[in-house]
Amino acid sequence: MVYYPELLVWVSQEPFAYKEMEGGLIKGRLPVPKEVNRKKMEETGAASLTPPGSREFTSPATSYLHPF
């Protein structure tokens, strides 16, 4: 364990120290629309497709290596 005397952290045993803070985390989190999730899934799926004419068993990271 390393001790840094210049760092000071306050730890409270209560989940919310002040009444004003109550519910602050719930208000700050917004639900992500399903359209955004679907778009991300489509982009990652398109990125993992093998280009035409390449061998399917090679990984995309090594697809630039060609046998001579």
Swiss-Prot record:
Description of what induces expression: Down-regulated in lungs by dexamethasone treatment.
Subunit structure: Interacts with FLNA. Interacts with the latency-associated peptides (LAP) of TGFB1 and TGFB2; the interaction results in a decrease in TGFB autoinduction.
Compartments (UniProt record): Cytoplasm
Gene: Nrep
Modification after translation, per record: Phosphorylated on Ser-59. Phosphorylation decreases stability and activity.
Positions of region (Disordered): 42-68
Domain of life per record: Eukaryota
Gene Ontology terms: biological process: axon regeneration; regulation of neuron differentiation; regulation of transforming growth factor beta receptor signaling pathway
Keywords: Cytoplasm, Phosphoprotein
Protein name, per record: Neuronal regeneration-related protein
Observed effect of gene inactivation: Normal heat and mechanical sensitivity, as well as normal formalin-induced inflammatory pain. Reduced formalin-induced avoidance behavior, which reflects pain-related negative emotion, indicating a role in the affective, but not in the sensory component of the pain. Also exhibits altered behavioral responses in learning and memory.
Primary role: May have roles in cellular differentiation. Ectopic expression induces differentiation of fibroblast into myofibroblast and myofibroblast ameboid migration. Increases retinoic-acid regulation of lipid-droplet biogenesis. May also have neural functions. Promotes axonal regeneration and augments motility of gliomas. Down-regulates the expression of TGFB1 and TGFB2 but not of TGFB3. May play a role in the regulation of alveolar generation.
Tissue localization of expression: Expressed in brain and fetal lung.
Primary location group: cytoplasm
InterPro entries: Neuronal_3.1
One Gene Ontology CC term in the entry: cytoplasm
